[in-house]
């Protein structure tokens, strides 16, 4: 109901100006959704802020505003007579005919009343997932991948040009030590594709890391190998390319399972730009040499001794680091010679907040961030086990993402087979596989997205696969229930009656919930909190279930029957759209 809210806000502001022409400054109606259904649809609190400057009681001010509103025929066409409550709140209830007209407009509209941005603005970049080459994706990559994908989907649906970037860790010292180790223990891996699988590569990486930590001669050889790689040595580059390809194929298997679309642009892409970053910082007077390292001292960030903390961009040996690469990425992403983006969103764990705050500050001070552009860090908490600690295997290892997804599907299949047996239902193996895969992966995604991303959350297969509560299976089942109406003879896509007729409180509660979709999507677009969309879909499912359990649909007389079927259709379409923005496909049967 964003359009109606904007209209009401303009009408309220005009009424305030007419009632109090002597008021200074811009008048703010302070319009928002009503805090409780009994207070109507909207509540305006602007009278309270005017009490002090006008030296009048808030209720007296509210009464004057209401009088002007009621003199406006356009307002009277939208809403019932406003009510003044409490110290001076103005409660506004929309007319039933207005709500019914809004429902009619949304039925059959693929956007369900959600407006697209008016004109194509500068691209929006969402940087997410970002695993490291030669390492398997683990549970720590789950949140970045799922949250980033959801945000990209919402922004794309709103009409933004979105560039989904996978900033993979494909460069650095680790390749020097890995290539050096493989030359000695598995040379075939450096010149033959698929000579080893990723699991073996990970094991070799661990061995190489141990040797690097323990053996000084190995360290020296590894660093020499890095120099060769950076210098464009053909043999080293071929080995590096094979290692990257091997990891890339394994990553893609995970992305395909989760229906994630990404454009890979790894750290190596920015290598040719690193020296220019340091030169720019030096020429702008920001770069300071401290103990041999090139750094920029941060403003407003001090250490234990009260001294400004540095952001190191060039090590004392002349090498570069993550900060240099991230600065080069910002410079390219926002620059007219690069992506020309207007908004860059980084989806990483909360532990990197200080790093990004420093990098963003330096980029702004260097003049690489245009006035209209924004850099946003989207932090998230840890995935924990039932013990409240970081999720680990029983052996204490990090949980591989592949294993976690496999177990989710296996558990969903076991639950489904048990339910089929209890209900004495016969279904094909292909049906069981499809439903179990959809439910299992949806449960993992939804459990993550439904939690406020800023907080940690405890991973529990039992909770996330439950058919009750704020879970993916509960939402999917609501869609299945509506699909069942069509199977029972209720044409959900039938012609609408000439006039939609709604009488029951359960109908109006569902309608008001359905009409909030555009406002919720707008909130997610600005606040980047997917749990807001999850909460909305859960409350919508609850509202639909109350309506369907308490109000006859198929057995109702006309025009109530057609009107209620239209509500069912809009509820199904809204749930399906909302789930798709979370990256979750719907099911017709479960």
From Swiss-Prot:
Main location as per UniProt: cytoplasm
EC number: 6.1.1.19
Location of the motif 'HIGH' region: 131-141
Keywords assigned: Aminoacyl-tRNA synthetase, ATP-binding, Cytoplasm, Ligase, Nucleotide-binding, Protein biosynthesis
A Pfam family assignment: DALR_1
Catalysed reactions listed for this entry: tRNA(Arg) + L-arginine + ATP = L-arginyl-tRNA(Arg) + AMP + diphosphate
Protein family according to the UniProt entry: Belongs to the class-I aminoacyl-tRNA synthetase family.
Quaternary structure (record): Monomer.
Protein name: Arginine--tRNA ligase
Gene: argS
């Amino acid at each position: 109901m964003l359009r109606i809210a904007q209209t009401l806000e303009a009408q309220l502001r005009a009424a305030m100006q007419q009632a109090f022409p002597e008021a200074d400054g811009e008048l703010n109606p302070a319009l928002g959704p009503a805090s409780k259904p009994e207070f109507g649809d909207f509540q305006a609190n602007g009278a309270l802020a005017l009490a002090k400057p006008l030296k009048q009681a808030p209720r007296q001010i509210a009464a004057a505003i209401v009088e002007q509103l009621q003199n406006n025929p356009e307002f009277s066409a939208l809403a019932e007579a406003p009510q003044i409550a409490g110290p001076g709140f103005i409660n506004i209830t929309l007319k039933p005919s207005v709500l019914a007209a809004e429902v009619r407009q949304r039925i059959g509209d693929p956007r369900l009343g959600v407006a697209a941005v008016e004109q194509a603005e500068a691209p929006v970049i969402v940087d997410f997932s970002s695993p490291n080459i030669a390492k398997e994706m683990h549970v720590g990559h789950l949140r970045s991948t799922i949250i980033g994908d959801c945000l990209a989907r919402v922004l794309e649906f709103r009409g933004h040009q979105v560039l989904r970037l996978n900033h993979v860790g494909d460069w650095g010292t680790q390749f020097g030590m890995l290539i050096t180790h493989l030359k000695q223990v598995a040379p075939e891996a450096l010149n033959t594709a698929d000579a080893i699988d990723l699991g073996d590569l990970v094991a070799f990486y661990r061995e190489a890391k141990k040797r690097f930590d323990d053996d000084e001669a190995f360290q020296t050889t590894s660093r020499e190998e890095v120099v060769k790689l950076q210098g464009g040595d053909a043999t080293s580059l071929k080995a590096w390319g094979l290692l990257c390809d091997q990891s890339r194929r394994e990553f893609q298997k995970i992305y395909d399972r989760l229906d994630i679309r990404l454009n890979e642009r790894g750290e190596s892409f920015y290598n040719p730009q690193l020296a220019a970053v340091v030169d720019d910082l030096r020429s702008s007077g920001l770069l300071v040499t401290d103990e041999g390292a090139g750094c920029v001292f941060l403003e407003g960030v001090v250490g234990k001794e009260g001294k400004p903390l540095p952001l190191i961009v060039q090590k004392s040996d002349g090498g570069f680091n993550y900060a240099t690469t991230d600065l080069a990425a910002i410079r390219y992403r926002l620059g007219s010679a690069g992506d020309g983006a207007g908004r860059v969103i980084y989806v990483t764990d909360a532990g990197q907040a200080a790093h990004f705050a420093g990098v963003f500050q330096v980029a702004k001070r260097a003049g690489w961030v245009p006035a209209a552009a924004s850099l946003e860090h989207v932090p998230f908490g840890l995935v924990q086990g039932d013990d409240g600690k970081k999720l680990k295997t029983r052996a204490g290892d990090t949980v591989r993402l592949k294993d976690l997804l496999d177990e989710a599907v296996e558990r969903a299949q076991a639950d489904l087979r048990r339910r089929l047996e209890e209900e004495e239902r016969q279904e094909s193996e292909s049906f069981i596989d499809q439903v179990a895969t959809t439910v299992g992966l949806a449960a993992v995604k939804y459990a993550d997205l439904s939690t406020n991303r800023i907080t940690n959350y405890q991973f529990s297969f039992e909770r996330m696969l439950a058919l009750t509560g704020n879970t993916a299976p509960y939402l999917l089942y609501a869609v299945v229930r509506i699909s069942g109406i069509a199977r029972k003879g209720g044409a959900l896509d039938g012609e609408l009656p000439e006039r939609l007729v709604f009488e029951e409180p359960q109908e109006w509660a569902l309608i008001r919930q359905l009409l909030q979709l555009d406002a919720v999507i707008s909130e997610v677009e600005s606040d980047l909190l997917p749990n807001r969309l999850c909460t909305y879909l859960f409350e919508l499912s609850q509202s639909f279930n109350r309506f369907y359990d308490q109000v006859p649909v198929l057995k109702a007389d006309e025009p109530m029957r057609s009107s209620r079927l239209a509500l069912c259709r809009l509820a199904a379409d809204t749930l399906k759209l909302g789930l798709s923005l979370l990256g979750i496909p719907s099911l017709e049967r479960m």
